């Protein structure tokens, strides 16, 4: 791919910045940022990973891939994504054979078949020949990794790398736990219609959630989903705030310095992709609502 001319790159970067600033929230900014990288800079395939505790990093957003990969995980130190996270610096691969080896390493390490089906398959490009992994940092704190790949050799020049780094910098503050809103919101009650009840299984050992026996999600997003479903089953409540989740003693061990808004986006997108009959929708800054097309029966183990 030809290197971007300085003036062209700057004009397009200004347009990307304008689009991101116009986005209403983090979820929208992620979608706009990745779509604009493809449209304006021909960076066609991108993923954003965020830390997931001991599980390494997990995919929160992607562009240019088939649906189904949100929530896939990559261990720290493995593959280009894991190494960029561990070293906290930008890494690139443009060599064909080395690039293929890196891709194989990512696919081998990402969401392996373990934990009795509690993992989501990685959806990256198997024959990628160009890769770019940029850590999202505030100071020395790792907030994520912005990853790009392409089947074309030499797809990313120096200015492509700079543009992806600038987008990573722009997303850093949004992904910081300090950026979350603390707006209160009143509870509400919902009564979905008469399909067969949704059987929800929750396993406390790894905070994993299953719908009708099918794995949904685990770790902090699983704890959040369990919390709101528990409140819904007990009282019919459907409206919640990020502030109350952060203050919930049952979630304290999971949250740490994690950004709840980012984990909520991961949960929302995972539900959209695989379980559209359960939805997490925004109702305001720092507020969200649980929507179900079926009543739920919760089992805990």
Describe each PLM feature range.
Residues 1-28, 39, 59-60, 143:
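Signal-transmission linkers at sensory-effector interfaces
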Residues 22-60, 68-69, 78, 178:
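Helix-loop-beta substructure at the N-terminus of cytosolic sensory domains
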Residues 118-121, 129-137:
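A short, aliphatic-rich beta-strand micro-motif
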Residues 183-185, 216, 231-232, 253-301:
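DNA-binding patch around the recognition helix
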Residues 214-247, 267:
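Short amphipathic alpha-helical recognition elements used for nucleic-acid or partner binding
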């Amino acid at each position: 791919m030809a290197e971007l001319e300085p003036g062209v790159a700057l004009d397009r970067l200004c347009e990307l910045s304008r689009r991101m600033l116009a986005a209403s929230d983090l979820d929208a900014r992620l979608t706009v940022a990745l779509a604009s990288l493809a449209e304006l800079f021909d960076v066609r395939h991108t993923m954003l990973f965020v830390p997931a505790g001991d599980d390494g990093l997990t995919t929160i957003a992607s562009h240019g891939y088939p649906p189904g990969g949100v929530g896939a995980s990559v261990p720290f130190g493995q593959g280009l994504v894991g190494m960029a996270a561990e070293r906290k610096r930008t890494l690139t691969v443009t060599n064909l054979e080395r690039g293929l080896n890196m891709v194989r390493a990512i696919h081998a390490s990402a969401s392996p078949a373990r934990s009795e089906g509690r993992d989501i398959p990685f959806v990256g490009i198997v024959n990628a020949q160009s890769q770019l992994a940029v850590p999202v940092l505030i100071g020395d704190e790792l907030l994520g990794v912005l990853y790009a790949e392409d089947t074309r050799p030499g797809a990313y020049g120096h200015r492509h790398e700079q543009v992806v780094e600038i987008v990573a910098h722009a997303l850093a503050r949004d992904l910081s736990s300090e950026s979350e809103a603390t707006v209160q919101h009143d509870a509400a009650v919902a009564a979905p219609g008469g399909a067969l009840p949704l059987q929800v299984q929750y396993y406390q050992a790894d905070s994993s959630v299953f719908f009708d026996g099918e794995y949904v999600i685990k770790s902090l997003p699983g704890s959040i989903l369990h919390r709101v479903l528990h409140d819904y089953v007990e009282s019919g409540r459907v409206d919640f705030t990020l502030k109350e989740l952060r203050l919930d003693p049952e979630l304290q061990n999971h949250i740490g310095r994690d950004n709840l808004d980012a984990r909520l986006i991961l949960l929302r997108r995972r539900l959209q992709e695989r379980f559209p009959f359960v939805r997490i929708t925004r109702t305001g800054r720092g507020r969200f609502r649980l929507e179900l097309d079926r009543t739920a029966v919760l089992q805990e183990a």
